[in-house]
């Protein structure tokens, strides 16, 4: 085969040779004749055609053999003499797909065979039980046949005895007839009792066969012998009837056992089918019940969260209205009319309002200012600051969420703002009687606000988590650890901002400020200090429990979005309840707690309710 492929067999025509080459046997050659040239050329062409046909057939056979060889090597990989496995890179993908298809088909066939094997095992078990029952029936049948043979032998014995007795009776009758021969001619001799079947049939026929038909019976037989023979015959007939009844009972028992066996087989098949269907239905029912329970729990949780969001929004509106009313009433009680209605910041003197005093220049601050319902002049009710006073005022001012930057003789938080208008310290007015103290003043008498803020830096409320834009950078609560549900002790500077963010004064105060309704006379500006707010100032209590409410305007909303932890609605509810009373209560179970009760324990109590309400 290789020699045929290696040989280059080709016949060129004269045109394919070229102009310089000539045929050796061409007609132009004088050495050879024309007939010989044409004959040799035709023979070569014929041989070439035959060889081409043979080569084509061999190539087709070779391709077919190669395909078969590749298929066989895929199914049964062969190893060459050198220990290397034959691989065909051109058919790797097809081989892999064929192997996968064959693997899947073989796996299916294996599963089918296993299923059939299991069925065959069950059928073998059933067949074994049937064989055991059949063997029992066969044993019982053989026992019955043995008993029947014994009874037949007994009946035959009794029949022989009866025949012997009949012969004896006939002999006695013959002797008696010989004695009375002179009275009557001799009777014919009786045939011997050799036919036992006749007597057996007579016995099985019942007692209807009377003794009157017996041959040779004469009334001269003694009554005693006749009675004895009749009793023996009746006993044999009774035994035969008993054997017949026992045979019928055993046949009925055999038929009953066969019927019970068939019934047991049918009930077992029905039980197998019903048990499988019952298991499937129980699984479907259990899965459906679980899905219904999950859907109901999710619906209840969604409704409860909606109610909690509505309650928190209602509490926020009530608290804002209450704080606005408190701020208005406190400003009217603790500030003179001239200072409250002054549109520009000025420094009033301790003299009466009729006496004019030179106005002080406004307090200067390097940071942006925010409008406030009170002027930036200090009052005796404010705390001291290391900076020099800019505009002292003898009149107590209304408390605001942002502390002013002017100095007063009262305690005030420190601020690096330079003094702008120093003034003599006036005498503070007498405080109002205790009965006239407002609700906000009673709230200011509570413990410092940093304790409240540190106690309520726990989990976020569900209503705040629903606003995904405000907490885009925060991780979802279900991905946090279990310890994240408890309050985390943090420094005051990192309560509203992360450890890597700068604490700018404007962002610090815009995130927690309160927005009061603008009065026509409140056109002054509040100076925002450059230092962070102190946790001891009384005015920050307002902002500490109002920071959880979303502020609708864009600057405050932007600052609110930078907060890492927002207060949850239980903290707002508890702080609102502590404003008017000395007893705080759980918003979920209405359990009362004293004011001195630790905030961490109270938050754990509320978190226990929230954890129990989860699915």
Curated annotation (Swiss-Prot):
Residues 326-458 are annotated as: Disordered. Residues 345-365, 389-406, 416-435 have a biased composition (Pro residues). InterPro entries: CALCOCO1/2_Zn_UBZ1 (IPR041641), TBD (IPR024581), TBK1-IKBKE_adapters (IPR051891). The keyword Transmembrane does not apply. GO terms for molecular function: zinc ion binding. This is TANK-binding kinase 1-binding protein 1. It comes from Homo sapiens (Human). The modification Phosphoserine is found at residues 184, 365, 372, 379, 385, 400, 415, 504, 534. GO terms for biological process: defense response to virus; type I interferon-mediated signaling pathway. Pfam families: TBD (PF12845). Residues 280-329 are annotated as: Interaction with TBK1 and IKBKE. Residues 48-162, 221-276 form a coiled coil. The lineage of its organism: Eukaryota, Metazoa, Chordata, Craniata, Vertebrata. Adapter protein which constitutively binds TBK1 and IKBKE playing a role in antiviral innate immunity. Homodimer. May form a heterodimer with NAP1. Interacts with TKB1 and IKBKE. Weakly interacts with DDX3X. Residues 1-279 are annotated as: Homodimerization. One of its GO terms (cellular component) is serine/threonine protein kinase complex. A zinc finger (UBZ1-type) spans 583-609. Zn(2+) binds at residues 586, 589, 605, 609. The keyword Metal-binding applies. It comes from the Eukaryota. Detected in leukocytes, lung, placenta, small intestine, liver, kidney, spleen, muscle, heart, brain and at low levels in thymus.
């Amino acid at each position: 085969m290789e020699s045929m492929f290696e040989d280059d067999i080709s016949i060129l025509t004269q045109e394919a040779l070229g102009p310089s080459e000539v045929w050796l046997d061409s007609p132009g050659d004088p050495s050879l004749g024309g007939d010989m040239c044409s004959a040799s050329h035709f023979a070569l062409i014929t041989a070439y055609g035959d060889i081409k046909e043979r080569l084509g057939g061999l190539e087709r056979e070779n391709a077919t053999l190669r395909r078969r060889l590749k298929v066989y090597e895929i199914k049964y990989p062969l190893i060459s003499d050198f220990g290397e496995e034959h691989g065909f890179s051109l058919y790797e993908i097809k081989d892999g797909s064929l192997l996968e298809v064959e693997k899947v088909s073989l796996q299916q066939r294996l599963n089918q065979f296993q299923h059939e094997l299991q069925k065959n095992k069950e059928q073998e078990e059933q067949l074994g039980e049937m064989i055991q029952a059949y063997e029992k029936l066969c044993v019982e049948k053989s026992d019955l046949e043995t008993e029947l043979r014994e009874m037949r032998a007994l009946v035959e014995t009794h029949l022989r005895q009866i025949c012997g007795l009949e012969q004896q009776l006939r002999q006695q009758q013959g002797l008696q007839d010989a004695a009375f021969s002179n009275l009557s001619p001799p009777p014919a001799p009786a045939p011997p009792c050799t036919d036992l079947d006749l007597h057996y049939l007579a016995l099985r026929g019942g007692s209807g066969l009377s003794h009157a038909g017996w041959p040779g019976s004469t009334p001269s037989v003694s009554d005693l012998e006749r009675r004895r023979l009749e009793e023996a015959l009746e006993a044999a007939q009774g035994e035969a009837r008993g054997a017949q009844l026992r045979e019928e009972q055993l046949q009925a028992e055999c038929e009953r056992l066969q019927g019970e066996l068939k019934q047991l087989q049918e009930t077992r098949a029905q039980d197998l089918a019903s048990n499988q269907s019952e298991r499937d239905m129980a699984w479907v029912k259990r899965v459906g019940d679980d899905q219904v329970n999950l859907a109901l729990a999710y619906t209840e949780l969604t409704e409860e969260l909606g109610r909690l969001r509505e309650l928190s929004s209602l509490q926020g509106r009530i608290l804002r209205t209450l704080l606005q009313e408190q701020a208005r009433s406190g400003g009217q009680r603790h500030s003179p009319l001239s200072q409250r209605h002054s549109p520009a910041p000025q420094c009033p003197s301790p003299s009466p309002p009729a006496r004019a005093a030179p106005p002080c220049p406004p307090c200067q601050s390097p940071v942006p200012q925010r409008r406030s319902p009170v002027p930036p002049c200090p009052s005796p009710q404010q705390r001291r600051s290391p900076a020099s006073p800019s505009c002292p005022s003898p009149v107590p001012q209304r408390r605001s969420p942002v502390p002013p930057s002017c100095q007063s003789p009262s305690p005030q938080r420190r601020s690096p703002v330079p003094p702008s208008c120093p003034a003599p310290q006036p005498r503070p007015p007498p405080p109002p009687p205790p009965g006239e103290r407002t609700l906000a003043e009673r709230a200011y008498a509570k413990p410092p606000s940093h304790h409240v803020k540190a106690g309520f830096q726990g989990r976020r409320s569900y209503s705040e988590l629903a606003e995904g834009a405000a907490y885009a950078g925060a991780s979802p609560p279900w991905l946090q650890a279990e310890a994240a549900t408890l309050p985390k002790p943090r420094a005051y500077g990192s309560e509203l901002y992360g450890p890597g963010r700068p604490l700018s004064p404007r962002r610090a105060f815009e995130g927690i400020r309160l927005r009061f309704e603008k009065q026509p006379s409140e056109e002054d500006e509040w100076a925002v200090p450059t230092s962070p707010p102190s946790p001891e100032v009384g005015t920050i209590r307002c902002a500490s429990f109002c920071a959880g409410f979303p502020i609708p305007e864009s600057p405050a909303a932007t600052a609110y979005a930078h907060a890492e932890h927002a207060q949850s609605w239980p903290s707002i509810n508890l702080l609102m309840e502590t404003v008017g009373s000395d007893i705080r209560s759980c918003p979920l179970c209405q359990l009362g707690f004293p004011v001195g009760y630790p905030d961490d324990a109270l938050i754990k109590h509320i978190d226990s309710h929230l954890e129990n309400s989860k699915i």
